[in-house]
Amino acid sequence: NISNLITHMARGNTALSISMTGVSSLLAIVTTPLNILFWAALNPDTNALLRQVSIEPLSFLGSTMAILGIPMVLGLATVHYWPRLGHLLRRPLQIMSFLFLVAFIGGAIFTNARYLTVFVQSILPFVVLHNAIAIGLGWGTAKVLRLSDYDTRAMTIEVSMHNSGLGLALILNQFDGLGGAALVAAGWGVWHLISGWALAAWWKRRDPHPQGGSQVARTDTAE
């Protein structure tokens, strides 16, 4: 996951980052379709949109399971039963997934270029605000819990970066890219990359202080 790479670059607790990604991804298999269907049904406009595109809850859940659940199970099984193979494949798959995400986002932006002006003027400010709030929430929660700098960096990045690839896949699969929604998810992904790289660049120049009320076992951040 790109958040794990950003955490590693920021000299944060990569082990905590990976653990949080795993837990949130497992929860997202169920919570993502349920949240979309629940909140969209509360608004008359979006409720009509759900009926228009004929969203089936079980189909939505199945798509999320296929996108998130199956790759995760395969990855965990590989690492557990064939650890050497898992270690060998880790870096190539990280590079491939990053390149795929960039290509996926680029394709969505190109296909929905006609909505780009509207996105920049009407939606981008909310994307930036949402991301800033998430950064503050992650950092603030870590401080309240008195976590070390290593853990604070991991939590801040994990809370503030979201799975745009999942969003794009669901939009294209379930909504056919309706109304430029793919551009919204793609733009979200671009901004998260920008803010994530900025955080990593800031923290990379500063040694993390180990002091804190709690510190989760971490991997070597100096590798």
Where are these regions (language model features)?
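Alpha-helical transmembrane segments of multi-pass small-molecule/ion transporters
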Residues: N1-E223
